[in-house]
Amino acid sequence: MIKVVFMGTPDFTVPVLRRLIEDGYEVVGVVTQPDRPVGRKKVLTPTPVKVEAEKHGIPVLQPLKIREKDEYEKVLALEPDLIVTAAFGQIVPNEILEAPKYGCINVHASLLPELRGGAPIHYAIMEGKEKTGITIMYMVEKLDAGDILTQVEVEIEERETTGSLFDKLSEAGAHLLSKTVPLLIQGKLEPIKQNEEEVTFAYNIKREQEKIDWTKTGEEVYNHIRGLNPWPVAYTTLAGQVVKVWWGEKVPITEPAEAGTIVAIEEDGFVVATSNETGVKITELQPSGKKRMSCSQFLRGTKPEIGTKLGENA
């Protein structure tokens, strides 16, 4: 039986681990990030992958730094024939990459060489792409730069969010891995080098990227809101207060107005001008310190005026 070590951390990777188990491989160990404090009460919480591994009685390693010798030697001691990684969250050292008979492969949520990095799902939507996909490739020390083994495309729908696309790609990744591993073991795959001239990056989202830039086009603002839903959530400011924007709709604007200005207030939301003739009607939001709510609920208690400017004093 093929011995496999799986390395992964978030929800996205749980179906991948589950599929390895279902396909009959001997998963001899799981490597994931350490438990972290979560929520206001800072409750120490295991990663989703650790929870799944423990359901199946699989040994779990949680190195703080996988590149340290005493940590990676614990992985090598498991003597895997194959290592599968998916959103593990640390750079894996060569000592691990070169050890398994069948190599170390990674399940990445983009059509490489596009969108290397830790947030490819967010960027695919924020950049307005109509398709993305899954790439399975050999791992190298350089970020997401290994030779490609297999790929599958996934359509991005008009109202897609990072949350919905996350679920689709998670299942697509598990399915593609299930088809890829047997071909890899049988030596039936021809690795393809990535075209370095076509490389783009999707680095982890920073706080300053979450703020809506109303000077962009309506389409770009709409994509920004979708791409940060349901985490970390786009935000703007209204009357100097931070407001998270969970959802908005593209609407035509007939009268020119300064970007970021409220140009209409309707029953289900208020329309904000952008840099072109497409505005964004905010329909779901979350004022600072309050729960997520529909804009119609918000407007029952707060009455912004037409001409109010959003995005100031952030």
From Swiss-Prot:
Top EC class, one word: transferase
SUPFAM superfamilies for the chain: FMT C-terminal domain-like (SSF50486), Formyltransferase (SSF53328)
**Biological process GO terms, please?**
conversion of methionyl-tRNA to N-formyl-methionyl-tRNA
Pfam assignment, any one: Formyl_trans_C
**Highest taxon of the source?**
Bacteria
- Residues binding (6S)-5,6,7,8-tetrahydrofolate: S110, L111, L112, P113
Give me the Gene Ontology terms describing cellular component: cytosol
Q: Which GO terms describe its molecular function?
A: methionyl-tRNA formyltransferase activity
Task: Summarize the protein's role.
Answer: Attaches a formyl group to the free amino group of methionyl-tRNA(fMet). The formyl group appears to play a dual role in the initiator identity of N-formylmethionyl-tRNA by promoting its recognition by IF2 and preventing the misappropriation of this tRNA by the elongation apparatus.
Name the record gives this protein = Methionyl-tRNA formyltransferase
**Species for this entry:** Bacillus cereus (strain ATCC 14579 / DSM 31 / CCUG 7414 / JCM 2152 / NBRC 15305 / NCIMB 9373 / NCTC 2599 / NRRL B-3711)
Gene this chain is encoded by: fmt
